[in-house]
């Protein structure tokens, strides 16, 4: 696991619109102390997936802000928060970020 993110929760949301993802991640970053770890464009659609890191409470606040901002702009495909990611989850997240 990257020492930079050790002990941090992971928040992930996916929207049908890549443009809406950037608006939503901006809202998330302004709402709470989170680090945007990556944006992954969907290969088969115009959407994208955003990964962010921080304390559980900050990721929760950021996720709420992101989804509230995204809702009028795009369909929310999925979202989740992993409070204490396993080494396997950390490895999988790194693989999607560093490709």
Regions found by a protein language model. Name each.
Residues 2-6, 29, 40-44, 74:
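Solvent-exposed alpha-helices and their adjacent loops that cap or buttress functional pockets
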């Amino acid at each position: 696991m990257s020492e930079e993110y050790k002990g941090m929760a992971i928040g992930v949301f996916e929207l049908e619109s890549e443009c809406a993802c950037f608006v939503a991640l901006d809202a998330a970053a302004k709402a709470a102390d989170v680090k945007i770890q990556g944006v992954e464009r969907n290969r088969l659609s115009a959407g994208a997936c955003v990964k962010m890191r921080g304390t559980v409470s900050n990721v929760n606040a950021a996720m709420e802000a992101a989804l509230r901002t995204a809702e009028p702009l795009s369909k929310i495909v999925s979202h989740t928060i992993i409070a204490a990611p396993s080494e396997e989850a950390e490895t999988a997240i790194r693989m999607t970020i560093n490709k």
